[in-house]
Amino acid sequence: MNANLFGIKGLSLIISSVMLFFVFGCASAPKEFDAKITGPQLIVEPDTITLGVANLLKKPIIFKGKGFKPGDSVFVSLLGVEKGGQKMDIALADAEVDQAGGFVAGVPTLSKITELLRADMGSNAKMENIVIVSKPPIPAGTYTARAVSMESNLKAETPFCIKGPSVGDSIKDWLGGLAGKIVKK
């Protein structure tokens, strides 16, 4: 009996180790600016997202830039997104450029819901915010994110990969539906 129990514990340890490797070993390293470039630069963290509702709403998407004119305003857009049969740019974030020429722009929840998920916000009977999904999200693919400053018209671009919902995302969204936080129509 003890030998069989040890075998199960050993197998559990191996499976746990493999799972931890997949979770932590496959994560990409934090993005850094290229020291060789003197002009405007843009990076995004994470550089890949999935379109699961629950996962996307909890995950911060941060655009960082440097090499812009201090005191300027910067707007970050996703280029070439198919919407209504046409390709168009969608606004995701904005920020003020600091005195060092850098900025940090987080994508707000409303932009994630309306632009990336193409969903709506509403309220449930408890007056809690809910996400109402009635259309498919933007198509999966690798897009270009562009930061443009308003006064100086400086520009910088970075790739931004958007993937469809994973199996884990689907499970989280199903649980969100059971909790009344995600409504699919």
Regions found by a protein language model. Give the residues of each.
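Extracytoplasmic/secretory-pathway segments with low complexity and glycosylation-like composition
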Residues: 26-185
